[in-house]
A protein has these predicted regions:
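Conserved N-terminal structural segment that caps and organizes enzyme catalytic cores in eukaryotes
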Residues: 1-50
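Short, conserved "active-site rim" segments that organize catalytic pockets and cofactor/ligand binding
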Residues: 33, 37-96
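Structural motif
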Residues: 43-44, 56-58, 98, 110-114, ...
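Short amphipathic alpha-helices and their capping/turn segments at secondary-structure boundaries
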Residues: 46-50, 97-105, 139-144
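Conserved, mostly hydrophobic/aromatic
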Residues: 59, 76, 113, 153, ...
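Active-site alpha/beta core segments
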Residues: 86-119
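Phosphate/ribose-phosphate-bearing ligand recognition and processing surfaces
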Residues: 120-280
Length: 280
């Protein structure tokens, strides 16, 4: 599969321009966040295989052992080779809501950040959200501390850990925006949300415009909503023609590996998940 350079991963600004992301509408101006061209030029969204991204760091949806598991976790360990597991064995695990960093070995990125998201609990929604936000905030801090200029997140906790995709996307995007507004926010040149299954794709298509609104006036006549039952792989599509093949190529990536890992995962992760659960 083709390696994807960070420069070819579409930003929110580009997705708005290509009519791949629908601008949000707000009931009143008070509810609407202030648009930021700077933020929109640094936040990116793509659907595909996170192991093929040539970025500073990718964020693995890890478990507490950090020894590999199913879905994205297993795919990253397989693509990185045995060196990653060897280094992870020295880390003595990781607490839920936190993250640790390793080298990337055979992956095209420079570092792998292993974030341990929460198992979702409908009884402790606030605690789940706090732990999930902690994964994103800690990962961003680790990226900056290790001189990474770009970082790509998988959709943490939305697979077998049961976090509803829409709620998880909202927590993730809010945590990233809070970081951008902080003291170290200008130290990362690109922050990427890498999705794969349709429920995560739809969640980020919905929430990104609500935290990072378009800086241009929306032209509603140009939009055609994805029909029910269709995969919203690239979000809503434009009625107008003229988008170049090169621009289109930036919006899609090859499929993520789906085979189970050969070692390192706890017993619960050895169970074969459904298609929608092939990641944490």
């Amino acid at each position: 599969m083709t390696i994807v350079p960070v420069s070819e991963i579409p930003t929110v600004s580009l997705l708005y321009h290509l009519r791949k992301l629908v601008p949000a509408t707000f009931k009143n101006e008070v509810d609407a966040p202030k648009p930021s061209q700077s933020f929109n030029d640094r936040i990116a969204l793509i659907r595909g295989d996170i192991t093929k991204l040539q970025v500073g760091a990718i964020v693995n949806a890890a478990n507490n052992s950090l020894l590999g598991g199913g879905g994205v976790d297993g795919a990253i360990h397989r693509a990185a080779g045995p060196g990653l597991l060897k280094e992870c064995r020295k880390l003595n695990g990781c607490d839920t809501g936190s993250a640790k960093i390793t080298d990337a070995y055979e992956l095209p990125c420079k570092k792998v950040i292993h974030a341990v998201g929460p198992v979702y609990s409908s009884r402790f929604v606030n605690e789940s959200a706090e732990d999930l936000a902690g994964c994103y905030t800690t990962s961003l801090k680790l990226a900056v501390a290790n001189d990474c200029k770009s970082i790509a997140f998988s959709a943490l906790s939305t697979g077998v850990y049961g976090y509803p995709s829409s709620e998880a996307a909202s927590v993730a995007i809010k945590a990233v925006k809070n970081f951008l507004e902080g003291a170290d926010g200008d130290k990362l040149e690109k922050i990427i949300f890498c999705t794969f299954v349709p429920k995560d794709v739809d969640a980020y298509n919905h929430w990104l415009p609500r935290f990072f609104p378009s800086t241009e006036e929306p032209e509603t006549d140009d939009w055609e909503e994805v029909e029910a039952g269709e995969s919203a792989e690239n979000g809503p599509v434009a009625k107008e023609e003229g988008i170049s093949t090169t621009e289109e190529a930036k919006v899609a990536l090859p499929d993520v590996p789906t085979a189970e890992p050969t070692e390192g995962g706890p017993a619960t992760k050895k169970l074969k998940p459904s298609d929608d659960d092939k990641k944490l």
